[in-house]
């Protein structure tokens, strides 16, 4: 009897040691992560089979037994996962219980138009294309903003998403992010800023975004536009003309383009255009509501990304001749 008990004891110790070893043994042997998709309603046994089918080097029954013994088998969450090299049965279960799905990223770039945003979303083959057949107006209605122009309404940032996420869901996140940023910027506006509403701040910020080549000039550029708004001067900013031309713009802005009237042409129409012309980032939003204190009414690109600012038309014309026409003073 003693000998039998001794053998039982040895077997228990051995099985316990084997289980402990297995729980810490990597499930994958390759360098590339395994892709695992768990559909809603999949049973724990089905999850174990899916893990093995994805390429894990283990036994499905053994993995299922581990799920059951852990007491967490019913807490496994559906989703799209990546099982990286070195993942053990223990760390796998922790990942599945926490719902740590594999996340991809999409960057919406400062200065992009809504059209460019849609093009970027359409290129993402891991995103569900729920808006592909919708017009811009229909998209805004789906987002709860019927009648609101989509331009500039989405905050440029890098967004993480799980495989199979809806493009509409990502747009909703970007929309709400811009809501928060715009609200914060408007609350921090200077007391003398010549803007009547957050919408006007968003419009001006979009212009500042498109006009700024060097970050250090941003507040100064906003200051020029603020000064022009205060005294009733035309803003005369090329990016608004380009936006108004739409697909007619061929990359070369001509004098006749400046004279072609559109709702966005700030050479032919006073004040701000009716909508933003692009997505402004946080810095452009803050510059629009906290413009630099300056006497400048003009600026011209110097060719190195920076701008030259002038207080008079004569000075501005000399700067244009110098920096854009290559004429000496």
Predicted feature descriptions by range:
Residues 1-33:
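N-terminal type II signal-anchor transmembrane helix
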Residues 2-6, 33, 74-75, 112-115, ...:
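Short low-complexity stretches enriched in small and charged residues
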Residues 6-11, 54-55, 78-80, 130-134, ...:
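N-terminal start-of-chain detector that recognizes signal peptides
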Residues 8-10, 35, 105, 299:
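N-terminal hydrophobic or amphipathic segments with adjacent small-residue motifs
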Residues 16-21, 63-66, 86-92, 176, ...:
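Short hydrophobic/aromatic-rich motifs at helix boundaries and adjacent loops
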Residues 25-185:
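Signal peptide-directed extracytoplasmic domains
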Residues 43, 119-128, 141-329:
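Bacterial extracytoplasmic/cell-wall-associated proteins, especially those involved in peptidoglycan
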């Amino acid at each position: 009897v003693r000998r039998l008990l001794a053998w039982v004891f040895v077997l228990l110790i051995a099985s316990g040691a084997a289980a402990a070893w297995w729980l810490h043994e990597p499930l994958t042997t390759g360098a590339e992560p395994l892709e695992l998709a768990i559909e809603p309603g999949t049973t724990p046994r089905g999850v174990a089979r899916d893990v093995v089918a994805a390429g894990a080097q283990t036994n499905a029954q053994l993995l299922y037994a581990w799920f059951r013994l852990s007491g967490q088998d019913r807490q496994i969450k559906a989703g799209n996962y990546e099982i990286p090299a070195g993942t053990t049965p223990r760390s796998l279960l922790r990942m599945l219980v926490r719902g740590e799905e594999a996340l991809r990223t999409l960057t919406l770039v400062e200065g992009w138009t809504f059209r460019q945003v849609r093009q970027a979303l359409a290129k993402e083959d891991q995103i569900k294309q729920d808006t592909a057949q919708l017009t811009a107006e229909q998209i805004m209605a789906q987002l709860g903003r019927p009648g609101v122009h989509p331009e500039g309404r989405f905050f440029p940032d890098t967004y993480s998403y799980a495989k199979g996420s809806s493009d509409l869901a990502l747009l909703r996140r970007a929309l709400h992010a811009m809501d928060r940023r715009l609200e914060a910027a408007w609350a921090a506006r200077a007391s003398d800023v010549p803007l009547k509403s957050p919408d006007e701040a968003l419009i001006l910020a979009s212009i500042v975004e498109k006009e700024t080549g060097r970050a250090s000039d941003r507040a100064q550029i906003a200051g020029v536009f603020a000064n022009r708004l205060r005294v009733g001067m035309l803003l005369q900013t090329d990016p608004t003309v380009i936006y108004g031309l739409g697909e007619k713009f061929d990359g070369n802005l001509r004098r006749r383009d400046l004279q072609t009237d559109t709702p966005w042409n700030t050479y032919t129409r006073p004040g701000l255009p009716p909508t933003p012309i692009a997505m402004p980032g946080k810095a452009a939003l803050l510059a629009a509501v906290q413009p630099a204190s300056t006497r400048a009414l003009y600026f011209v690109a110097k060719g190195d990304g920076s701008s030259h600012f002038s207080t008079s038309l004569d000075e501005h014309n000399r700067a244009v001749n110098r920096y854009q026409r290559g004429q000496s003073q």
